[in-house]
Amino acid sequence: MAETNNECSIKVLCRFRPLNQAEILRGDKFIPIFQGDDSVVIGGKPYVFDRVFPPNTTQEQVYHACAMQIVKDVLAGYNGTIFAYGQTSSGKTHTMEGKLHDPQLMGIIPRIARDIFNHIYSMDENLEFHIKVSYFEIYLDKIRDLLDVTKTNLSVHEDKNRVPFVKGCTERFVSSPEEILDVIDEGKSNRHVAVTNMNEHSSRSHSIFLINIKQENMETEQKLSGKLYLVDLAGSEKVSKTGAEGAVLDEAKNINKSLSALGNVISALAEGTKSYVPYRDSKMTRILQDSLGGNCRTTMFICCSPSSYNDAETKSTLMFGQRAKTIKNTASVNLELTAEQWKKKYEKEKEKTKAQKETIAKLEAELSRWRNGENVPETERLAGEEAALGAELCEETPVNDNSSIVVRIAPEERQKYEEEIRRLYKQLDDKDDEINQQSQLIEKLKQQMLDQEELLVSTRGDNEKVQRELSHLQSENDAAKDEVKEVLQALEELAVNYDQKSQEVEEKSQQNQLLVDELSQKVATMLSLESELQRLQEVSGHQRKRIAEVLNGLMKDLSEFSVIVGNGEIKLPVEISGAIEEEFTVARLYISKIKSEVKSVVKRCRQLENLQVECHRKMEVTGRELSSCQLLISQHEAKIRSLTEYMQSVELKKRHLEESYDSLSDELAKLQAQETVHEVALKDKEPDTQDADEVKKALELQMESHREAHHRQLARLRDEINEKQKTIDELKDLNQKLQLELEKLQADYEKLKSEEHEKSTKLQELTFLYERHEQSKQDLKGLEETVARELQTLHNLRKLFVQDVTTRVKKSAEMEPEDSGGIHSQKQKISFLENNLEQLTKVHKQLVRDNADLRCELPKLEKRLRATAERVKALEGALKEAKEGAMKDKRRYQQEVDRIKEAVRYKSSGKRGHSAQIAKPVRPGHYPASSPTNPYGTRSPECISYTNSLFQNYQNLYLQATPSSTSDMYFANSCTSSGATSSGGPLASYQKANMDNGNATDINDNRSDLPCGYEAEDQAKLFPLHQETAAS
């Protein structure tokens, strides 16, 4: 039911595109002059529209200025239409579609798709929306479904409200802007386009994108519906400009024919006086009948070219827009009343009918009093408004003007006349009703006859089409079976490949684990070595302290002994001092040897640097010679080309001379024949013989002179050709020689380059050795200083010890030598102390050696530590690469799974092509239940189980790789102990899956009622998945 009628005019907007490159190169002028926002002047004549857009207007400005309001109207229950009309290459498709996925350049259709859902999400949550779209084109005056290319000749019918619609057109239910854009992309790829002289992407058909929106208030049960037609008309063409021919020419004829029918409809509606509007002249005007003068709010874009080259077409387009601006539409809300509203309306109409019946009864009573000759006073008469209402209600009942005349007749005759009048009135009413019924029946039969004719034609076409497609469908059935077998085989191969990849990933994981274990062992070894080094250092320090304490104690004992013994000389450990001095000398010799080696290495490095500079200089000289040779070769090649061209011209001249020679020979033969004729004639005419001889001699002399000149010219040309040939041969030899020299120079250059590379490598090695020698030199210098300090300290201690012992011995000798028995014990004690001193000296020497060994071992340990750190970094990099490889394999397998899902979905959708669609309700304030990866909201069971098994294996790998990152897993509560034990090949292990409740759950679906794909006695357990939220 429709109510709330509003009369509105068609909104006409004019848009000019910029001059294109071809028009700029042709020098066309920019002819429009813009006056304000609603007027443009072409050729001195102003044209006024609702809005005029100059060339610098952006797509967003166009949409906000005129197309945004129509979205609100459609959501409020009105029908809407947006046209794009104009000549070819005027920017219609750019205005309607633009670049679909570019936020700046997208046209009206993608912006409307986005805006519809933005409005829905901001509306009351009690509203539920059902949105379906269809996309078709009118090509060669045939309706072709762009979403199902097998439907090539659809027919136009009318619904119960006599609104035209395309029967059998594919309708897709959508729940997000991305799904609408996917539908547009699919239809756009099937639309007919061609290349013409005026447009590289010329549309060869009229496209209509229909959005049907139905909404229902869940509380009040009120239902509204609105349709939005988005029409991109093909441009009118002038064959002389587009250069159309062949099939493109036939397309242009049909385009111009349908646009002419549209112009006739616009003209008939603009005049307003014609009772017949030719909607049926074209299928396009038939489909858009409601948009032109019907129940719709229509906006028309007239797209124009600003070039002076298209002046006539631009004026015609502007005049078309002015005519369309005068058309009036009657837009009304498409409202379906609820039972309560129908009840209220029925009660209201019932009360109105009751009041009208009471008024009629009063009027009939007053009329009967007048007919009876009674005079009705004014107080008893009905009021004017009630009388007018009664007249409106009873206007179908004719009243005799003479009935108010008072006639005195008998009551019986009056009653007889009244009955006769009532009978006649009743017959008259019956006849009127019968006439109306018959006229309605005639109209209905006419319409049924037209519908039957159309149905007969379409049925014949459908019958032929069905007969043609029957065999095609049989072949397609066989092909589909083969494709199913191929898909199953591909799935089996994919399963085998997945097993192999899984094994490879497990091997990589094991290798990574081994490397991690090795790394931990290396780290533990390094820590133990560090602790051992620290312990040795502590032991060395402790021993040094002990040696110092022992020396101090020894000094005390010797001082006491010198007091007791006297001035006896003490034998010093000369062998120890000699050993220390010998070791020090060996160290000095080793250091001097290293210095000499370093000097020789530095000298060798300098020589190599000089040699490298010399090689670079030679390479530069060789490069310059090579470039000069290449220049000389290019010059000789140019000279050879010029000589070749000259030879060709000489050959051509020679050919011309030979042709002229042949023509002269022919002329000579003709002259000889004529001479023979003349000789014969001269025999008859002897008086003229002398003249003929003179003529003959003259001709012979002339021919001889021509022949000699020709021979001279031929000889001269032959000589020139021989000279040029010699020159060419010499140049070829020279070119070959230069080519050989160039190859030789290139070989020398490559050789020098390789030598330079080898020398640079050696230089790098020597530099590395030099750096190592410098480091060793520094280490040895430090070691030498440390040893020198230790030896100096030890030498000083020995000197002090010897001096102290000597002084004490002298003092003890000066004392009384009476106790001779104690001297022997004292000597034994001195020898004991000397032995202890010798042992301490050996221990000190051993500690110095150990220290030197540790210093030598320290760089090795540091190098090993660096190598271990590098190994750790390499292992970390390998681990990271393994993770990335696993993720890439995961994405690749996911893409393969999506492709297989799409193939299975396409097959299943092809099988259920004629079944009912399931609407996907859209609630305001919520996001769609489906995602871009799941556009139809369903998944085949095979793909569900296979995808779940894939993701479960990836979860296990991810758990092995990163056991600590449990918050980023795709699954929860993974039952890793359950394995697949089903049979039926590699594919069956991925297809047979169940949960505790026996249902398989798709990871991209938020439903839990999908049936399991394959039933078996022993099914593998399916891992429970997280349910996706509506926002994802």
From Swiss-Prot:
<feature type="region of interest" description="Globular">
    <location>
        <begin position="907"/>
        <end position="1032"/>
    </location>
</feature>
<feature type="region of interest" description="Disordered">
    <location>
        <begin position="906"/>
        <end position="939"/>
    </location>
</feature>
<dbReference type="GO" id="GO:0005874">
    <property type="term" value="C:microtubule"/>
</dbReference>
<dbReference type="GO" id="GO:0003774">
    <property type="term" value="F:cytoskeletal motor activity"/>
</dbReference>
<dbReference type="InterPro" id="IPR027417">
    <property type="entry name" value="P-loop_NTPase"/>
</dbReference>
<keyword id="KW-0493">Microtubule</keyword>
<dbReference type="GO" id="GO:1990049">
    <property type="term" value="P:retrograde neuronal dense core vesicle transport"/>
</dbReference>
<keyword id="KW-0225">Disease variant</keyword>
<keyword id="KW-0547">Nucleotide-binding</keyword>
<feature type="modified residue" description="Phosphothreonine">
    <location>
        <position position="397"/>
    </location>
</feature>
<keyword id="KW-0067">ATP-binding</keyword>
<dbReference type="GO" id="GO:0098971">
    <property type="term" value="P:anterograde dendritic transport of neurotransmitter receptor complex"/>
</dbReference>
<dbReference type="GO" id="GO:0019894">
    <property type="term" value="F:kinesin binding"/>
</dbReference>
<dbReference type="GO" id="GO:0043204">
    <property type="term" value="C:perikaryon"/>
</dbReference>
<dbReference type="GO" id="GO:0005524">
    <property type="term" value="F:ATP binding"/>
</dbReference>
<keyword id="KW-0887">Epilepsy</keyword>
<dbReference type="GO" id="GO:0007268">
    <property type="term" value="P:chemical synaptic transmission"/>
</dbReference>
<dbReference type="GO" id="GO:0008017">
    <property type="term" value="F:microtubule binding"/>
</dbReference>
<feature type="coiled-coil region">
    <location>
        <begin position="331"/>
        <end position="906"/>
    </location>
</feature>
<keyword id="KW-0505">Motor protein</keyword>
<feature type="domain" description="Kinesin motor">
    <location>
        <begin position="9"/>
        <end position="327"/>
    </location>
</feature>
<dbReference type="GO" id="GO:0005737">
    <property type="term" value="C:cytoplasm"/>
</dbReference>
<dbReference type="GO" id="GO:0048471">
    <property type="term" value="C:perinuclear region of cytoplasm"/>
</dbReference>
<keyword id="KW-0523">Neurodegeneration</keyword>
<keyword id="KW-0206">Cytoskeleton</keyword>
<feature type="binding site">
    <location>
        <begin position="86"/>
        <end position="93"/>
    </location>
    <ligand>
        <name>ATP</name>
    </ligand>
</feature>
<dbReference type="InterPro" id="IPR001752">
    <property type="entry name" value="Kinesin_motor_dom"/>
</dbReference>
<feature type="region of interest" description="Necessary for interaction with ZFYVE27">
    <location>
        <begin position="271"/>
        <end position="361"/>
    </location>
</feature>
<dbReference type="GO" id="GO:0005871">
    <property type="term" value="C:kinesin complex"/>
</dbReference>
<feature type="region of interest" description="Disordered">
    <location>
        <begin position="978"/>
        <end position="1010"/>
    </location>
</feature>
<comment type="subunit">
    <text>Oligomer composed of two heavy chains and two light chains. Interacts with GRIP1. Interacts with FMR1 (via C-terminus); this interaction is increased in a mGluR-dependent manner. Interacts with ZFYVE27. Interacts with VAPA, VAPB, SURF4, RAB11A (GDP-bound form), RAB11B (GDP-bound form) and RTN3 in a ZFYVE27-dependent manner. Interacts with BORCS5. Interacts with BICD2. Interacts with DTNB.</text>
</comment>
<dbReference type="GO" id="GO:0016020">
    <property type="term" value="C:membrane"/>
</dbReference>
<feature type="compositionally biased region" description="Low complexity">
    <location>
        <begin position="978"/>
        <end position="989"/>
    </location>
</feature>
<feature type="modified residue" description="N-acetylalanine">
    <location>
        <position position="2"/>
    </location>
</feature>
<dbReference type="GO" id="GO:0005829">
    <property type="term" value="C:cytosol"/>
</dbReference>
<feature type="region of interest" description="Microtubule-binding">
    <location>
        <begin position="174"/>
        <end position="315"/>
    </location>
</feature>
<dbReference type="InterPro" id="IPR019821">
    <property type="entry name" value="Kinesin_motor_CS"/>
</dbReference>
<dbReference type="GO" id="GO:0007411">
    <property type="term" value="P:axon guidance"/>
</dbReference>
<dbReference type="GO" id="GO:0099641">
    <property type="term" value="P:anterograde axonal protein transport"/>
</dbReference>
<protein>
    <recommendedName>
        <fullName>Kinesin heavy chain isoform 5A</fullName>
        <ecNumber>5.6.1.3</ecNumber>
    </recommendedName>
</protein>
<dbReference type="GO" id="GO:0008574">
    <property type="term" value="F:plus-end-directed microtubule motor activity"/>
</dbReference>
<feature type="compositionally biased region" description="Polar residues">
    <location>
        <begin position="991"/>
        <end position="1003"/>
    </location>
</feature>
